[in-house]
UniProtKB/Swiss-Prot annotation:
Protein name stated in the entry: Probasin
Stated induction or repression of this protein's expression: Androgen-regulated, increases in concentration with zinc uptake.
Keywords: Disulfide bond, Nucleus, Secreted, Signal
Coarse class of the protein's main subcellular location: nucleus
PANTHER family to which the protein is assigned, alphabetical: LIPOCALIN, PROBASIN
Gene Ontology molecular function terms on file: odorant binding; small molecule binding
Lineage start: Eukaryota, Metazoa, Chordata, Craniata, Vertebrata
Subcellular location as annotated: Nucleus; Secreted
InterPro entries attached to this UniProt entry: Calycin, Lipocalin, Lipocalin_CS, Lipocln_cytosolic_FA-bd_dom, OBP-like
Residue pairs linked by disulfide bridges in the UniProt entry: 79-170
Tissue specificity as recorded in UniProt: Prostatic epithelial cells.
Family from the record: Belongs to the calycin superfamily. Lipocalin family.
Positions in coiled-coil regions: none
Species per Swiss-Prot/TrEMBL record: Rattus norvegicus (Rat)
């Protein structure tokens, strides 16, 4: 039932329209950097928290039914690389990371990608996260407005938005396995 509500909500918000695009692979595959994150529970994205992800790369198969996400998490001053595999069912990807995660992607333009996910941890706590990935280090004013509107549509408070790019000291390169 929750998945159906999630799909309906995201469809109404226009997020799912990107998922059926024929050029999906071209739009999302490549090197990306996390610029901002926002969460329903802001402590889940604070420095050192497992949902504070420093993205590096997204890869997907022919129709993007399977997607590989490469990112770092910082534990103290140390960066740990992760690769998670999302499998698509309808317009939502499902993956195992810090419990179970359901996520969606939305392109803004060739340089900006929005994402939204629900994470249910091992204690059954649910956190909603909305982020923006970019090819560069800054967003234009219009891109920032688009992201803040996205955060609001996802039901996350403005004060829970954090610029994570400034704390990203992890390596630029990743090991693709």
């Amino acid at each position: 039932m929750r998945v159906i509500l999630l799909l309906l909500t995201l469809d109404v918000l226009g997020v799912s329209s990107m998922m059926t695009d024929k050029n999906l692979k071209k739009k999302i595959e490549g090197n990306w950097r996390t610029v901002y994150l926002a969460a329903s529970s802001v402590e889940k994205i604070n420095e050192g928290s497992p949902l504070r992800t420093y993205f590096r790369r997204i890869e997907c198969g022919k129709r993007c039914n399977r997607i590989n996400l490469y990112f770092y998490i910082k534990k103290g001053a140390k960066c740990q690389q992760f690769k998670i595999v999302g499998r698509r069912s309808q317009d939502v990807y499902y993956a195992k990371y810090e419990g179970s995660t359901a996520f969606m992607l939305k392109t803004v333009n060739e340089k900006i990608l929005l994402f939204d996910y629900f994470n249910r941890n091992r204690r059954n706590d649910v956190t909603r996260v909305a982020g923006v990935l970019a090819k560069g280090r800054q967003l234009t004013k219009d891109e920032m407005t688009e992201y803040m509107n996205f955060v609001e549509e996802m039901g996350i408070e403005d004060e829970n938005v954090q610029r994570v790019m400034d704390t990203d000291t992890c390596p630029n390169k990743i090991r693709i396995r």
